[in-house]
Curated annotation (Swiss-Prot):
Residues 1-26 form the signal peptide. This is Agglutinin isolectin 1. CDD domains: ChtBD1. It comes from the Eukaryota. Residues 198-212 form a propeptide. N-acetyl-D-glucosamine / N-acetyl-D-neuraminic acid binding lectin. The modification Pyrrolidone carboxylic acid is found at Q27. Keywords: Chitin-binding, Disulfide bond, Lectin, Pyrrolidone carboxylic acid, Repeat, Signal.
Length: 212
């Protein structure tokens, strides 16, 4: 009886995990998902799916850590930023001092969070980028050249063709050797990270990596 009970619990737990993974993979957003936003600054692709990497954050990205900063504020007819991002004094959406500091027009204005090699290798929370100067944020100043981790605007090489390099933030290394989150990265052929399509752990981890 005890063995059957243990087996039933194990099967139940497996079913819950499978359901969570399927839910994460199928998460819809943007115009195709009732204008929902993705959690933890994951990008909403042009096709309305949440993830991270070029397929999600590149061309057509609707919200989240898109590689092209959205316009906002007085320079964009009073438009506001999605994902609770700051609108800088120059009318661009993002996170960090350049966006949330002096002249910030809207959003959670706050101080910088340190990260990267300048902070003992700490990662930023919620998929924020760690700039070359060691501060967390979103936008070209953080996710562009020299970006150390997070939603960097260039897919970082990984896997067997990159000397066995693993992705930061527990992102998946796809079969093509690039880092990201989503079925195309964590599914068939995934080399490391939250593989086998179960990338919900990677999403959750990024919400608790570093607290202010």
């Amino acid at each position: 009886m005890k063995m059957m009970s243990t087996r039933a619990l194990a099967l139940g737990a497996a079913a819950v995990l499978a359901f969570a993974a399927a839910t994460a993979q199928a998460q819809r957003c943007g115009e195709q998902g009732s204008n929902m936003e993705c959690p933890n600054n994951l990008c909403c692709s042009q096709y309305g799916y949440c993830g991270m990497g070029g397929d999600y954050c590149g061309k057509g990205c609707q919200n989240g850590a898109c590689w092209t900063s959205k316009r906002c504020g007085s320079q964009a007819g009073g438009a506001t930023c999605t994902n609770n991002q700051c609108c800088s004094q120059y009318g661009y959406c993002g996170f960090g001092a350049e966006y949330c500091g002096a002249g910030c027009q809207g959003g959670p204005c706050r101080a910088d969070i340190k990260c990267g090699s300048q902070a003992g290798g700490k990662l930023c929370p919620n998929n924020l980028c760690c700039s070359q100067w060691g501060f967390c944020g979103l936008g070209s100043e953080f996710c562009g050249g020299g970006c150390q981790s997070g939603a960097c605007s260039t897919d970082k090489p990984c896997g067997k063709d990159a000397g066995g390099r693993v992705c930061t933030n527990n992102y998946c290394c796809s079969k093509w050797g690039s880092c990201g989150i989503g079925p195309g990265y964590c599914g068939a052929g995934c080399q490391s990270g939250g593989c086998d399509g179960v990338f919900a752990e990677a999403i959750t981890a990024n919400s608790t990596l570093l607290q202010e």
